[in-house]
Amino acid sequence: NYAERYLFESTLRYDGSSRFPKNNKYGFFPSLAVGWRISEEDFFKENQSLDWISNLKFKASWGKLGNQNIGNYPWQTVFNLGQNYPYGDNLMLGAAVTTATDPTIKWEETETYDFGFESVFWNGLLSLNTSYFWRKTDDILYKPSGSVSSVLGQTVSEMNTGRMKNTGWEFEIGHRNNIGSISYNVNANFSIIKNKVLSLGVGNVEQLNGMVGNGSDLFIGFPMEMYYGYLTDGVFISNEEVKEWPDQSQLIPQSQKGDIRYKDISGPDGIPDGKVDPNYDRVYLGSRIPKYTFGLNLGAEYKGLDLSMQIQGVAGVSGMLEGFAGWALCGEGNVQKWQDEGRFDPNNPKRYPSYPRMQEVSGAAGFNTLPSDFWLLDASYIRLKNIQLGYTLPTKITTKAGISRLRFYVTAENPCTWNKYRKGWDPEINSDGRYYPILSTYTFGVNLKF
């Protein structure tokens, strides 16, 4: 720190982990940050037209971080017991190597660049911080199961394979003020994030439709945790319609009215071929990673009465309910109200019902429950995370009872959420329903200080 104008900070990390082999046990992860408080320069202070700017700092940083979030000793080849084999009339006890390992595994590295500024205006009345970040992760620790043929008879342990990039903007704005006996503050944040898979390394498997990835939720050029499935156009409203629709017998052996109509997107020649199949007709549908995240904190106080509120939300994110959460009669389970009310009714057929024809679905999936935009949901939401109202008795009253401070308060945590998701399900948790929901909690309390 030189004269509160020029700032420099650096960190040098040399970390070791027993989860990597001897030759790659250690990793070196440096970082540095610089800042320039231009508002402390003489030419800035002497310019009266800039008096409204109380503080202005430009900043930049660069750094590397390592990740060792894997199991213990994944690089070691071990024999697993219980690999028994019949020999004649006897069952012989056996052991075998069931996992292919990588003896050269090492630290996963993430490199980050960050540029931005911090500012304060009118002596703290308003603040604004903005930054742009570029983050790239190399040598991702991952199990590329799709890179190994099942004929091998072995699974794959973690190895360094794949690269990923995240870029985005972060904004923070704050305002605080006093008006008579009222003091208040408002702080908001907003971020834009773009995630992209650059490579899966040995997991780069080219699909017949030209996309390169693991065939399920990781593809080069797309975000992580993506939904990969079919485009649809409602359901069949008559059995005669089935004959006029592209052949989708590879998905539904015998389509009938009430079944989902899957679109024919492409074929071996790059154009629709009159058939719907998993090799050419699956596309990117959306991602579980939010593109936008935001938050708002509010606070106010008036003569002992105080109020605070925290709001949080995301947008530009997709969700999909599966299993017990999304499918009626799943594993001989229940039928939810929205499924019953929105299901296809053969007596009153609709092209775009909320649910296709009712049928029992196994625990795995059914013909009408394949990943598709029919089941895709907008998982954006705004949630009131916390709200608290309190009152502190005046000291002239509490001191008579020998109490220095007495405050009563009521708090509500997660009291309400605004979203377009299925009623009763939390858009923040993409699941098949086997989880405890986020609870709403209401509390009354007393703070007593002598």
Question: Which residues fall in each region the model found?
Answer:
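Extracytoplasmic gating/loop element in the C-terminal half of outer-membrane beta-barrel translocons
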Residues: 17, 314-407
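Short helix/loop capping segments that flank catalytic or ligand/cofactor-binding pockets
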Residues: 69, 228, 239-240, 308-310, ...
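Conserved small-residue
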Residues: 159, 178-287, 348
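Conserved SET/PR-domain catalytic core that frames the SAM/AdoMet-binding pocket
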Residues: 187, 280, 290-304, 385-390
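Phosphate-sensing "switch" segment of ASCE/P-loop ATPases
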Residues: 220-222, 303, 329
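Glycine-rich, aromatic-lined ligand/substrate-binding cores of catalytic
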Residues: 285-321
